A protein has these predicted regions:
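Short-chain dehydrogenase/reductase
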Residues: 2-84, 98, 108-109
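Substrate-binding pocket helix/loop in short-chain dehydrogenase/reductase
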Residues: 101-102, 109-114, 196, 207
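Active-site loop immediately N-terminal to the catalytic Tyr-X3-Lys motif
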Residues: 103, 150-156, 178-179, 214, ...
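Alpha-helical segment proximal to the catalytic Tyr-Lys
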Residues: 130, 174-178, 235
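C-terminal helical subdomain
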Residues: 185, 208-233, 237, 246
Length: 250
């Protein structure tokens, strides 16, 4: 029996990348998986991800949704509850970057990143918590970043959104703990994804030189951490931030 057998996980921004890795990991441990992305089609990978999850013998469905839209989020969560029966695990993974130095950053760049990265998490937590309260149990995982812990020049919007996700997880942990709901955050470091693969080899080597393990992490590293926080292995863990960064930040 898998660690998540009989549970339903809802993961945002999971058509590819870290979100997809988490979805597949959860499914391999027996969870039924509902996931969202801006598009669920062949072009953007959503339908392929849905098929890969289902091939592991669990129920899987992708929902096209703008996670930053409060009304759309409420509608998605209602559909997941109706079609899956419960929401036991919520992973707030949806995120974007629109980098720029402070004096060159536009209001649109700031607002877009805060909306997708931070407001979306509020939207989904707000919609899922009533379901979890009725179940007297639930695990909420916010995908933050080491940038949210230490900041990063040229990423003030992204850093602020990720720091907000950490504070949001801690606040929800305090507020919802008496209801049996746990909330934690994962702060990945330099992870090998399509986003980081687009960087030059020189930049990638410079990053690796700053990491004690001398390499970037993998999406599997993050998925394994998410599995721990989603499962009963972490039943007494709440309000925490786990940095998965190869020792980059100590």
């Amino acid at each position: 029996m898998g660690l998540l057998t009989g549970k339903t996980a809802l993961i945002t921004g999971a058509a590819r990348g870290i979100g997809k890795a988490i979805a597949l990991k959860f499914a391999s441990e027996g969870a039924n998986v509902a996931f969202t992305d801006l598009f669920i089609d062949e072009e953007h990978g959503g339908l392929a991800t849905e098929r890969e999850i289902a091939a592991l013998g669990v129920k899987a469905k992708g929902y096209a949704s703008n996670a930053a839209d409060f009304a759309q989020t409420a509608d998605v969560v209602a559909k997941v509850k109706e079609e899956f029966g419960s929401v036991d695990i919520l992973v707030n993974n949806a995120g974007i970057t629109k980098d720029g130095l402070m004096l060159r950053m536009t209001e649109q760049q700031w607002d877009a990143v805060i909306a997708v990265n931070l407001k979306s998490a509020f939207n989904f937590i707000h919609a899922c918590v009533p379901v979890m309260m009725r179940q007297c149990k639930g695990s909420i995982i916010n995908m933050a970043s080491v940038v949210g812990v230490h900041g990063n020049a040229g990423q003030s919007n992204y850093a602020a959104s990720k720091a907000g996700l950490i504070a949001l997880a801690k606040s929800v942990a305090q507020e919802m703990g008496p209801k049996g709901i746990r909330a934690n955050a994962i702060a990945p470091g330099f992870i090998d994804t399509a986003m980081t693969q687009a960087l030059s080899e020189e930049v990638r080597k410079e990053w690796a030189s700053k990491i004690p393990l001398r390499r970037g992490g993998t999406t599997e590293d993050i998925a394994n951490t998410a599995l721990y926080l989603a499962s009963d292995l972490s039943s007494y863990v709440s309000g925490q931030v786990i940095q998965v960064d190869g020792g980059m930040n100590m």
